[in-house]
From Swiss-Prot:
Main location: nucleus
Keyword Protein transport: no
Region listing for Modulating, in residue ranges: 1-52
Oligomeric form and interacting partners: Binds DNA as a dimer; homodimer and heterodimer with RXRB. Interacts with NCOA3 and NCOA6 coactivators, leading to a strong increase of transcription of target genes. Probably interacts with SFPQ. Interacts with C1D. Interacts with AKAP13. Interacts with TP53INP2. Interacts with PER2. Isoform alpha-2 and isoform alpha-1 interact with TACC1, but the interaction with alpha-1 is weaker. The interaction with isoform alpha-1, but not alpha-2, is decreased in the presence of thyroid hormone T3.
ZnF start-end (NR C4-type): 53-73, 91-115
Native organism taxonomy: Eukaryota, Metazoa, Chordata, Craniata, Vertebrata
Species annotation: Homo sapiens (Human)
Subcellular location: Nucleus
Protein name: Thyroid hormone receptor alpha
PROSITE patterns assigned to the protein according to its UniProt record, in alphabetical order: NR_LBD (PS51843), NUCLEAR_REC_DBD_1 (PS00031), NUCLEAR_REC_DBD_2 (PS51030)
Single GO biological process annotation from the record: learning or memory
The family this protein is said to belong to: Belongs to the nuclear hormone receptor family. NR1 subfamily.
The organism's place on the tree of life at top rank: Eukaryota
Annotated Gene Ontology cellular component terms: chromatin; cytosol; nucleoplasm; nucleus; RNA polymerase II transcription regulator complex
Disease per UniProt entry: Hypothyroidism, congenital, non-goitrous, 6: A disease characterized by growth retardation, developmental retardation, skeletal dysplasia, borderline low thyroxine levels and high triiodothyronine levels. There is differential sensitivity to thyroid hormone action, with retention of hormone responsiveness in the hypothalamic pituitary axis and liver but skeletal, gastrointestinal, and myocardial resistance.
Length: 490
């Protein structure tokens, strides 16, 4: 029987068999995959082992258009409906072909009829636009399930143990009792007048410039701020149990970081100011020109980024404890003990973050990155900009004294005094001289008058002090005595 021109010859699937190689031989396409290939794909768990396609008997791969079929019959049925090919199909044997995995490609009409007979639904075959919409819906459902799974995992994360709660309460109380103005800092702060700190006019020995009026204002709050950091540390049992030498090293290492953190968490985006020591609100240029230099940029940027975290007092307290108990400080004696203490605070910190259930994704690792940022940006940003050693703040010596990273280095003060007056004297002839004072003289006088020099008792003289200095042998007991008792007062 002749086939009509409009009909497709039996056994010539236009999708599966139309491709030919240059020599005229047929090439196998994806729809005509071998038995080995069809059996190696993903098989859903709801199928029984070796379950067969209801159309051709090949290995089934899942429910397709309401029937359990193989990939080949699924694709054949979809193409037939999408391209409306079934009216063109015909059979040479009066629609009596037996369809199995060997003969399925020999007669499209009988294969399609069997698809319909076993229950494959034509209305479930989607056109391109509907298929795209379905894919989008599937992705949305997957994303929703991922979020639900994330919420469940967050709810299942461990919260603080009773021992950790004790550690948390002690750190929180230590912070609150040493944090000036507490939660009322916005109501009690005073803005530094705009005309102060806007024009650095006094040149320092290293070439930097500073606004003396702003510097003078900052020196009024630096010693109480240092004292509060020392008091905070002394209220932590793990710190108090350390040798005096390690306490000094840890305080010298973290003083700048903790004061910077306390200022950063009091960043006000509306006025673009930081509140220092809980009482003085300053702008970026005022802080920079008052002695901090480029480090002020690091503190302001830290304040901006931390504002999105909405940290409470406990999180700030634990962050301070982690900064304090850092084994990165050189010269420590009890490194293992300090490391275990920091790990205890870190674990309690992580569990407390789980307890608060923040809405920020990956809150804990992001917060840990901020902890490292407090250290690295404050310690090294200035050094990179100024070309100074990484261990310093990267600002002029007076700026280091102002923020207390090394808490008034004895040699730095003596060097300035030697340039201007009697060596080693705290009240040399320069300070009593009645002639007009140079900028350096005025700066040194401010240092003495402000009481910053008394902060030496908090963290001791620098290790580089001259060995033959008359006072060097007497200062270490003074430091240990201060740490064991009250912090140094202004």
């Amino acid at each position: 029987m002749e086939q009509k021109p409009s009909k497709v010859e039996c056994g010539s699937d236009p999708e599966e068999n139309s491709a030919r190689s240059p020599d005229g031989k047929r090439k196998r396409k994806n729809g005509q995959c071998s038995l080995k290939t069809s059996m190696s794909g993903y098989i859903p768990s709801y199928l029984d082992k070796d379950e067969q396609c209801v159309v051709c008997g090949d290995k089934a791969t899942g429910y397709h258009y309401r029937c359990i079929t193989c990939e080949g019959c699924k694709g054949f049925f979809r193409r037939t409906i999408q391209k409306n090919l079934h009216p063109t199909y015909s059979c040479k044997y009066d629609s009596c072909c037996v369809i199995d995995k060997i003969t399925r490609n020999q007669c499209q009409l009988c294969r399609f009829k069997k698809c319909i007979a076993v229950g494959m639904a034509m209305d479930l075959v989607l056109d391109d636009s509907k298929r795209v919409a379905k894919r989008k819906l599937i992705e949305q459902n997957r994303e929703r399930r991922r979020k639900e799974e994330m919420i469940r995992s967050l709810q299942q994360r461990p919260e603080p143990t009773p021992e950790e709660w004790d550690l948390i309460h002690i750190a929180t109380e230590a912070h609150r009792s040493t944090n000036a103005q507490g939660s009322h800092w916005k109501q009690r702060r005073k803005f530094l007048p705009d005309d102060i700190g806007q024009s650095p006019i006094v040149s320092m020995p290293d070439g930097d410039k500073v606004d003396l009026e702003a510097f003078s204002e900052f020196t009024k709050i630096i010693t109480p701020a240092i004292t509060r950091v020392v008091d905070f540390a002394k209220k932590l049992p793990m710190f108090s149990e350390l040798p005096c030498e390690d306490q000094i090293i840890l305080l010298k290492g973290c003083c700048m970081e903790i004061m910077s953190l306390r200022a950063a968490v009091r960043y006000d985006p509306e006025s673009d100011t930081l509140t220092l020591s809980g009482e003085m609100a300053v702008k970026r240029e005022q802080l920079k020109n008052g002695g901090l230099g480029v480090v002020s940029d690091a503190i302001f940027e830290l304040g901006k980024s931390l504002s999105a975290f909405n940290l409470d007092d406990t999180e700030v307290a634990l962050l301070q404890a982690v900064l304090l108990m850092s084994t990165d400080r050189s010269g420590l004696l009890c490194v293992d003990k300090i490391e275990k203490s920091q790990e205890a605070y870190l674990l309690a910190f992580e569990h407390y973050v789980n307890h608060r259930k923040h809405n920020i994704p990956h809150f804990w690792p992001k917060l840990l990155m901020k902890e490292r940022e407090v250290q690295s940006s404050i310690l090294y940003k200035g050094a990179a900009a100024e070309g100074r050693p990484g261990g310093s703040l990267g600002v002029h010596p007076e700026g280091q004294q102002l923020l207390g990273m090394h808490v008034v280095q004895g040699p730095q003060v003596r060097q300035l005094e030697q340039q201007l007056g009697e060596a080693g004297s705290l009240q040399g002839p320069v300070l009593q001289h009645q002639s007009p004072k140079s900028p350096q003289q005025r700066l040194l006088e401010l240092l003495h008058r402000s009481g910053i020099l008394h902060a030496r008792a908090v963290c001791g003289e620098d290790d580089s002090s001259e060995a033959d200095s008359p006072s060097s042998s007497e200062e270490e007991p003074e430091v240990c005595e201060d740490l064991a008792g009250n912090a140094a007062s202004p």
